[in-house]
Amino acid sequence: RCCRCPFYFVKTQRSAESTMTKKEALSIVFSCAPLYKENLVDRSLLFITTDKHKNVHCLEVTFDIGNFLHMTGFKLRKSGINARHFFNLCYDKRLTEADFDFSADGTTEMKMRVLPSLMKKNLSAKMLGDYNMSQPKLYTDKIAGSLSACMGFVRDGGEGRFVPNTVLEGDIRTKVKAADRIIATYRKSRSEEQYSEIVFTAKKVEWEKIVLPDEYSYLVLPE
């Protein structure tokens, strides 16, 4: 009987942690899908950052309908539902509790807690950095976020444009090698060649000292 005690303790702890219901998760993705489509789908964001030496860097990321599934952590139970179909089911509020399971490691609930705050035009991102491999099971490359929520990006097909592949809870500074400050974020639709819309501007930036890379020298900086 004694040898069962530790096992029983762990089991009750896990069940206590898993407090979110499928109904609650559906409510979250149903509210996030329209925001994702309105603010991010078929658009690109350009992050302008400065490192601790005041060097200026730029990172462009692109969003598709099919990326939404990765952000939820849902495990689909039906092979007939692909990533694009999943988004449409969420957008139309037709996804059911029978269509998915939560990830066994608790990441689905974690992603549900932070997803709403990331569905903004600028992802609510204040910092950007290279992933520091701090979570062994997590594969991502670049991370943009804040002190409470982050989004991870990888190169599409291993090369080319960066696309989102996960969302994370917690302080970005614990997840990246060095957290560069985002001083401005621009947004454009995929059909546009250049960026013109500014969706985030940091405070206390000496804009007259900012020198952009040649590729983005056309950008109009904030004043």
Predicted feature residues:
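An acidic, glycine-rich, mixed-charge low-complexity segment common to nucleic-acid enzymes
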Residues: 1-141, 187-223
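Catalytic micro-motifs at enzyme active sites that drive phosphoryl/nucleotidyl and oxygen chemistry
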Residues: 136-142, 149-154
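Compact beta-sheet-dominated globular domain cores
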Residues: 147-157, 161-205
